[in-house]
Amino acid sequence: MEAFHTHTGIGVPLRRSNVDTDQIIPAVYLKRVTRTGFEDGLFASWRSDPSFVLNLSPFDRGSVLVAGPDFGTGSSREHAVWALMDYGFRVVISSRFGDIFRGNAGKAGLLAAEVSQDGVELLWKLIEQSPGLEITANLQDRNITAGTTVLPFKIDDHTAWRLLEGLDDIALTLRKLDRIESYEAAYPDWKPRTSPVA
């Protein structure tokens, strides 16, 4: 996964609360066996409405989603994060995230930045007053900048570290490859073991 330090992109105001993972990507789109190509399913039931924000310019080119409270609740669905990223989002800002969504986001490289609800509403207002407004998320400083407005955001230290280092679960495991290989080399031959597939 690519390391995340800062990202600047067009802000997209999603004035909806309690957006669950089934609304982010309906189950019918989960049949792929790959980890990419889910952008068509993102907010699929809402995108059929021509007035939905992602159907409007310049928001259709946005990469910073500003959502209402309780974003990403519901079932554990990594595909929700993948769909957002496949569409082009790198940051989601909300006052509250579903716990599992927040964890999946950090493991995939999507920044889930938690700001106050007043902060979310201020960002909505700024974006709607100036469509195309660019928003910058700075993970090192843990702040969101929109024009002259600077808002702090919360993220747990471990997730911030993983994002800054670009460590998904596999990369995190590979940091201990020497210890894993030493363990495997010392493992008795008479015990059951797995063998690599040729």
From Swiss-Prot:
The keyword NAD does not apply. It comes from the Bacteria. One of its GO terms (cellular component) is 3-isopropylmalate dehydratase complex. The keyword Cell membrane does not apply. Pfam families: Aconitase_C (PF00694). It catalyses: (2R,3S)-3-isopropylmalate = (2S)-2-isopropylmalate. Its EC number is 4.2.1.33. Belongs to the LeuD family. LeuD type 1 subfamily. GO terms for biological process: L-leucine biosynthetic process. Pathway: Amino-acid biosynthesis; L-leucine biosynthesis; L-leucine from 3-methyl-2-oxobutanoate: step 2/4. GO terms for molecular function: 3-isopropylmalate dehydratase activity. Keywords: Amino-acid biosynthesis, Branched-chain amino acid biosynthesis, Leucine biosynthesis, Lyase. This is 3-isopropylmalate dehydratase small subunit. CDD domains: IPMI_Swivel (cd01577). It comes from Mycobacterium avium (strain 104). Catalyzes the isomerization between 2-isopropylmalate and 3-isopropylmalate, via the formation of 2-isopropylmaleate. InterPro entries: 3-IsopropMal_deHydase_ssu, Aconitase/3IPM_dehydase_swvl, AconitaseA/IPMdHydase_ssu_swvl, IPMI_Swivel, LeuD. Heterodimer of LeuC and LeuD.
